[in-house]
Amino acid sequence: MEDEEVAESWEEAADSGEIDRRLEKKLKITQKESRKSKSPPKVPIVIQDDSLPAGPPPQIRILKRPTSNGVVSSPNSTSRPTLPVKSLAQREAEYAEARKRILGSASPEEEQEKPILDRPTRISQPEDSRQPNNVIRQPLGPDGSQGFKQRR
């Protein structure tokens, strides 16, 4: 490849026959390599004969996982201890205690009884001092024309 001429374009290379020579050269190299590599396959191929009986299928055993003390537990026993059932009063007491710890109040009713002072209250005006609701607008167009009132 040191003495090779490089054509200006592929059209010049095709006209001069340079592309054909390079292709033939590469084809010869690949044919030589393929002849060398036609040795027998390195992995043996096992062909099973259907006339011979097949061996027994492999047995699968499911093993039990031992518990922490090394004894295998039976499938019917549960490894978790049963929790005592709490009454409604006990659950409400625990809830109130947790709510007091987190929110600072024991019951949700206390929150609802307090008026919310963050929002301003709406001051109602007497009926006669209110503005009339029937506002008539007469829009103008972008160039100062009559807008929607203009007839075409």
Swiss-Prot record:
InterPro entries: SUZ (IPR024771), SUZ-C (IPR024642), SZRD1 (IPR039228)
Entry-linked PANTHER family: SUZ DOMAIN-CONTAINING PROTEIN 1
Name of the coding gene: SZRD1
Phosphoserine found at: S37, S39, S51, S105, S107
Pfam families from the UniProt entry: SUZ, SUZ-C
Compositional bias per record (Polar residues), positions renumbered to this chain: 66-81
Region (Disordered): 30-152
Composition bias, Basic and acidic residues: 89-100, 113-130
Family: Belongs to the SZRD1 family.
Protein's recorded name: SUZ RNA-binding domain-containing
Ranges where the SUZ domain occurs: 42-107
PTM sites of type N-acetylmethionine: M1
Lineage of source species: Eukaryota, Metazoa, Chordata, Craniata, Vertebrata
Annotated keywords: Acetylation, Phosphoprotein
Residue ranges annotated for the SUZ-C domain, each copy included: 111-152
